[in-house]
């Protein structure tokens, strides 16, 4: 048998996550694994199982999901990427297929992951191409969010940011970097550029303690897509969405940035704000050795 490594992108809007739901009543919910495995099995001539780096939830997107699968040696000559893509629906795409070491594991060999979360800072109008891919929050105090994010970076017990559903031996995780970056929808001359990791905070063009936008400010009164990036060695169930929910609560003024350490110290999920919607979240990249991941162990 030979092991293949697949890099996969998908729009999660009409998908019920990655994992096939074998015990669900028929018709089974449509999942990424449930779509891919029958195709790859037919091509391999036998039943196969795909193992992913992370099991994304319903509605979550990916442009850098990684999975591995074992196929018979005599099938190595097949153009797997082209052949699989020819059979896929429009919301799933294979970006790359390559042979991997026999002991490569998409989940356990990962050094870290990067997730992105997209916010739309007005509720008045969302461009059609962004429907199902952003959280329309309305205006936010991004500078207060910056201050709150600094409390989340680093190694902490994130029990207050874990939803139930997955057994883990420890809720301690390391968030190496949280950054916010404006997308191409920002107006010319806007103040924000992609920030440095909060572990070594530096804000380009403005100070993180600057007051929120007011009338006439480049960030005020306009529709903006704002992208947050979270990098870490691993994340608990819905941890990124829960951190995003907290940051938005701070941005709306429902919490103060300095409330974050106290919430984290409770280790109590009920003390943290509600989970952010799945629609804004994307699994953007999974890092494996050898690579230039700056936080490699």
From Swiss-Prot:
Q: Can you cite a GO biological process for this protein?
A: tRNA pseudouridine synthesis
Please report a single Pfam family linked to this protein.
PseudoU_synth_1
Does the UniProt entry include the keyword tRNA processing? yes
* InterPro entries per record: PsdUridine_synth_cat_dom_sf, PsdUridine_synth_TruA, PsdUridine_synth_TruA_a/b_dom, PsdUridine_synth_TruA_C, TruA/RsuA/RluB/E/F_N
Q: Name one GO molecular function term.
A: tRNA pseudouridine(38-40) synthase activity
Q: Which UniProt keywords apply?
A: Isomerase, tRNA processing
- Report the transmembrane regions from the record: none
Q: Look up the domain of life of the source.
A: Bacteria
In this protein, the active site sits at 57
Give the residues the record marks as binding substrate: 115
Q: Provide the reaction this enzyme catalyses.
A: uridine(38/39/40) in tRNA = pseudouridine(38/39/40) in tRNA
Give the enzyme's EC designation.
Answer: 5.4.99.12
Summarize subunit and interaction data from the UniProt record for this chain. Homodimer.
According to its UniProt entry, the function of this protein is described as: Formation of pseudouridine at positions 38, 39 and 40 in the anticodon stem and loop of transfer RNAs.
The record's family statement is: Belongs to the tRNA pseudouridine synthase TruA family.
This one is known as tRNA pseudouridine synthase A
Q: From what organism does this protein derive?
A: Nitratidesulfovibrio vulgaris (strain ATCC 29579 / DSM 644 / CCUG 34227 / NCIMB 8303 / VKM B-1760 / Hildenborough)
